[in-house]
Swiss-Prot record:
FixJ, when activated by FixL, induces the expression of both nifA, required for activation of classical nif and fix genes, and fixK, required for fixN activation. This is Transcriptional regulatory protein FixJ. The keyword Transcription applies. Gene3D superfamilies: 3.40.50.2300, Winged helix-like DNA-binding domain superfamily/Winged helix DNA-binding domain. Its cofactor is Mg(2+). GO terms for molecular function: DNA binding; metal ion binding. GO terms for biological process: nitrogen fixation; phosphorelay signal transduction system; regulation of DNA-templated transcription. Pfam families: GerE, Response_reg.
Length: 211
């Protein structure tokens, strides 16, 4: 559930940070406070799930610099940037760097809660996609070399006879390999198998022509 994902509030202003943390906690969210971007980065927080709410202007590492560092580390966290009046250009720059949203101070309580919940929802969905991609990748790794070749041919939309010709095996043997692939991939249908393969990055050839 999105509510179980962590929310990290980063602001050097104690009053703002504590007030925002209290507001989010009161709405049922799990919140951790950080007095600076450096403190957040030094905390060793997992960067694959959750949401960050950070001020754009902070001493040391600014909100924009934090976004750049998160990108460099391959983070998958939604980032909401808080800006002061007149900081819209900074907010636009933050969005270009991957921020999920920005809110101008003073912000409405309902608006910040809605923004955080929306970001957590996206983070949860992304997490599910990453988990699914990882699981499919493991299944593909369990295929034999020939089974992997048959899988790639199926993704390219090739018929059994064409696969047999391309691989130099009989159509009956292709059927056996195809059944093995379906079983190992735990796919209930060919469309599901293709979707799983595409999710894992098994891309069809540019010149592939279904036959």
């Amino acid at each position: 559930m999105p509510e179980s994902l962590p929310v990290h509030v980063i602001d050097d202003d104690d009053a703002v940070r504590e007030s925002l943390a209290f507001l989010l906690e009161s709405s049922g969210l799990a919140v951790t406070q950080h007095t600076s971007a450096a403190a957040f980065l030094d905390a060793g927080v997992p960067l694959d799930r959750g949401c960050i709410v950070t001020d754009v202007r902070m001493p040391g590492i600014s909100g924009l610099e934090l976004l750049k560092e998160l990108n460099a580390r391959g983070a998958h966290m939604a980032v909401i940037v808080m800006t002061g009046h007149g900081d819209v250009p900074l907010a636009v720059e933050a969005m270009k760097l991957g921020a999920a949203d920005f809110l101008e101070k003073p912000f409405d309580d309902a608006a910040i809660i809605a923004a955080v919940r929306a970001s957590l929802g996206r983070s949860a969905e992304q997490g599910r996609q990453e988990d699914a991609r990882s699981e499919v990748g493991k299944r593909i790794a369990g295929l034999s070399q020939r089974e992997r070749q048959v899988l790639e041919c199926l993704v390219n939309g090739l018929a059994n006879k064409t696969i047999a010709y391309d691989l130099g095996i009989s159509p009956r043997t292709v059927e056996v390999y195809r059944a093995n692939v379906m079983t190992k991939m735990k796919a209930a249908s060919l469309p599901e198998l293709v979707r799983m393969a595409l999710l894992a990055g098994v891309a069809p050839a540019d010149d592939a022509t279904p036959t």
